[in-house]
């Protein structure tokens, strides 16, 4: 019965508007409204990704190239053919030089010099400036190349994802050149190889990028302190003997200045106003960059050009900056009771037999034969140092 009476009924439920359910106006303070608006803007900014994420292929390619060049160096070195004693002789021509000669498990200094290692005498007297670039692609041993390439992967992948291969590639090469340049101005003896200067350039660029793009980062103080701590630890290692800290300092300084040039980004407010909803009236239009970013960009570019130009002029004139700076050597090595920074004097006897020169180290009695060439007389001291290790 009840069902029959209600069959023709149609019931509609209408929800009243929210304003009708509550006729009491709620007032919020200006500070609360501003805070809510900023939270909404930050939430929308987090969803809105204004910066393109790049696929990182350059850094892995650099790693592969460095490892390949190290393998080529070992192939050319051919220790069993050129030396009486070799480490891991079962590797054939890829065997390592003796530990006393190269504790990093790698080729001889002569092989690295043929491959393009940084030799100041070659740069100054033969004007082989290209060695300032080629040396950053070579490594002294297995331990050396592994340490540098792992660090490059750890640092470089993220930077390439954020800024692209063009800017990071230029940053890597120019920083490496800066490290080689400063190293050649102070380290006049021996040869130098390695990508450490370029790696420190990436660290320096990370620091300047954080400073110049300060407004777009959260937890910026924690990130800044962490980065400074990492940089300080790495630079502190450079005060140990046999570590080229001038290359580290030159690369870091170059990268720090290059970061202000290559890694500048628009400020937070610029992208925030672009993401405002339609109809929202912004208080004032934000410029793409802040004034201090322009100042840092111009200042850094001028310092880079002036520094590189002056450094090349001083280097090609053959000037030894150690004679003009009595304390600068402490930047690369600080003597303690555990080690000495002074190079031990070595003495050798030489004699010529036909087209070969016989060199004997007086300290350890080791003897080596060298084929005579035009540059052998000028490199006797270097060959003697290698023989007496």
From Swiss-Prot:
It is an enzyme of class 3 (hydrolase). One of its GO terms (molecular function) is serine-type endopeptidase activity. Expressed in roots, seedlings, leaves, stems and flowers. InterPro entries: Peptidase_S54_rhomboid-like (IPR002610), Peptidase_S54_rhomboid_dom (IPR022764), Rhomboid-like_sf (IPR035952). Disruption phenotype: No visible phenotype. One of its GO terms (biological process) is proteolysis. GO terms for cellular component: Golgi apparatus; Golgi membrane. The chain crosses the membrane at residues 56-76, 136-156, 163-183, 191-211, 221-241, 244-264, 295-315. The keyword Cell membrane does not apply. Keywords: Golgi apparatus, Hydrolase, Membrane, Protease, Serine protease, Transmembrane, Transmembrane helix. It catalyses: Cleaves type-1 transmembrane domains using a catalytic dyad composed of serine and histidine that are contributed by different transmembrane domains. The active site is at residues 196, 248. It is found in: Golgi apparatus membrane. Its EC number is 3.4.21.105. It comes from the Eukaryota. PANTHER family: RHOMBOID-LIKE PROTEIN 1 (PTHR22936:SF77), RHOMBOID-RELATED (PTHR22936). Probable rhomboid-type serine protease that catalyzes intramembrane proteolysis. Unable to cleave the Drosophila protein Spitz. Belongs to the peptidase S54 family. This is RHOMBOID-like protein 1. The gene is RBL1.
């Amino acid at each position: 019965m009840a069902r029959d009476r209600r069959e023709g009924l149609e019931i509609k439920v209408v929800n009243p508007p929210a304003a009708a359910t509550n006729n009491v106006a709620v007032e919020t303070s200006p500070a609360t409204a501003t805070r809510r608006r900023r939270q909404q803007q930050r939430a929308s900014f987090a969803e809105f990704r204004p910066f393109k994420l790049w696929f990182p292929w350059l850094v892995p390619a650099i790693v592969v190239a460095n490892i390949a060049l190290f393998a080529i160096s070992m192939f050319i070195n051919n220790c069993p053919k050129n030396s009486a004693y070799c480490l891991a002789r079962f590797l054939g021509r890829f065997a390592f030089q003796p530990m006393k000669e190269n504790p990093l498990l790698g080729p001889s200094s002569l092989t690295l010099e043929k491959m393009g290692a940084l030799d100041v005498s070659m740069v100054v007297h033969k004007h082989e400036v290209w060695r300032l670039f080629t040396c950053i692609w070579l490594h002294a041993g297995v331990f050396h190349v592994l340490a540098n390439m792992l660090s490059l992967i750890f640092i470089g992948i993220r930077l390439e994802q954020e800024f692209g291969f063009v800017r990071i590639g230029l940053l890597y090469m120019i920083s490496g050149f800066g490290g080689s340049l400063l190293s050649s101005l102070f380290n006049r003896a021996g040869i130098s190889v390695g990508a450490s200067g370029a790696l420190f350039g990436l660290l320096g660029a990370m620091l300047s990028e954080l400073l110049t793009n300060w407004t777009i980062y959260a937890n910026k103080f924690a990130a800044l302190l962490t980065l400074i701590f990492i940089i300080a630890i790495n630079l502190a290692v450079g005060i140990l003997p046999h570590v080229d800290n001038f290359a580290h300092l030159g690369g870091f300084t170059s990268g720090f200045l290059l970061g202000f040039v290559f890694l500048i980004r628009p400020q937070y407010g610029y992208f925030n106003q672009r993401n405002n909803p339609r109809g929202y009236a912004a208080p004032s239009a934000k410029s793409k960059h802040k004034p201090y970013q322009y100042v840092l960009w111009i200042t850094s570019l001028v310092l880079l050009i002036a520094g590189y130009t002056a450094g090349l002029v001083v280097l090609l004139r053959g000037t030894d900056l150690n004679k003009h700076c009595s304390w600068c050597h402490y930047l690369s090595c600080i003597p303690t009771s555990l080690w000495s920074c002074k190079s031990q004097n070595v003495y050798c006897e030489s004699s010529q037999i036909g087209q070969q020169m016989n060199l004997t180290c007086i300290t350890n009695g080791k003897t080596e034969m060298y084929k005579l060439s035009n540059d052998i007389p000028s490199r006797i001291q270097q060959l003697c140092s290698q023989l007496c290790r």
